[in-house]
């Protein structure tokens, strides 16, 4: 978390990355890109069953929610990794610290909330096959709580993501469902290279439904606050 916070504090201009990405509107661009991709993927037809992949559950309702400016987090622009997770970190052999970060293909200038929700997704996507027996946060002694992660990030980064987490969590789940829908589409066309593609494809709907449940939770909270 501290490494992520330090990364987000880097001024793009100070390292020659002022043209690395647009300084604002990150989530708007993500919504546009992923909704377009999802619509295309939904049209893929299985070569054997002739059944289309189909639209994600509550797709248009979810898009409308994320596109609603009154529900979106305050716009921010920092360097973002795009796939920040433990798998993409190199740790020191004997010391508890990160010494390298891998896989920068999706890096850009964007909203720091996206990286935070990506890294901490196992805390809120339990029940969608996103967690493993080896990592059950809040259950296995010694593993930090998400509140601890927020505190470590806030102390170094100077920004508290807590108010925006429900929205960010919902968006991450929706984004992930579209990525899995892509696996499903490639499997339907028998173009998927992974032997586990069919199993991954089965997770598309559960993740889309998980996103929708989180969207409804945010909507209910905002109704109670009189913002919707």
Annotate each language-model stretch with its function.
Residues 22, 160-172:
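All-alpha amphipathic helical-bundle segments outside canonical DNA-binding/catalytic cores
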Residues 79-81, 86:
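Catalytic-loop of the protein kinase fold
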Residues 89-91:
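Hydrophobic residue at the +6 position relative to the catalytic HRD Asp in the kinase catalytic loop
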Residues 100-103:
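Pre-DFG segment of protein kinase catalytic domains
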Residues 114-157, 172-190:
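Active-site activation/catalytic loop segments of kinase-like enzymes and analogous catalytic loops
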Residues 182, 186-228:
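Regulatory N- and C-terminal appendages and interdomain linkers associated
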């Amino acid at each position: 978390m501290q490494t992520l916070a330090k990364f987000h504090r880097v001024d793009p201009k100070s390292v020659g990355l002022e043209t690395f990405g647009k300084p604002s509107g990150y989530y708007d661009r993500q919504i546009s890109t992923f909704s377009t991709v999802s619509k295309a993927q939904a049209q893929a037809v299985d070569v054997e069953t002739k059944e289309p992949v189909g639209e994600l559950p509550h797709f248009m309702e979810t898009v409308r929610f994320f596109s609603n400016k009154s529900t979106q987090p305050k716009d921010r622009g920092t360097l973002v990794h795009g796939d920040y997770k433990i798998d993409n970190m190199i740790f020191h052999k004997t010391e508890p610290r990160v010494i390298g970060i891998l896989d920068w293909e999706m890096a850009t200038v964007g909203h720091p909330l996206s990286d935070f929700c990506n890294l901490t997704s196992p805390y809120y996507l339990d029940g969608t096959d996103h967690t493993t027996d080896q990592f059950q946060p809040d259950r296995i002694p010694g593993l930090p709580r998400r509140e601890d992660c927020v505190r470590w990030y806030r102390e170094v980064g100077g920004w508290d993501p807590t108010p925006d987490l429900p929205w960010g969590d919902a968006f991450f789940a929706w984004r992930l469902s579209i990525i899995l829908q892509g696996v499903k589409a490639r499997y339907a066309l028998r173009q998927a290279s992974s032997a586990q593609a069919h199993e991954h494809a089965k997770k598309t709907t559960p993740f889309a439904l998980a996103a929708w449940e989180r969207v409804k939770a945010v909507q209910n909270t905002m109704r109670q606050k009189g913002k919707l």
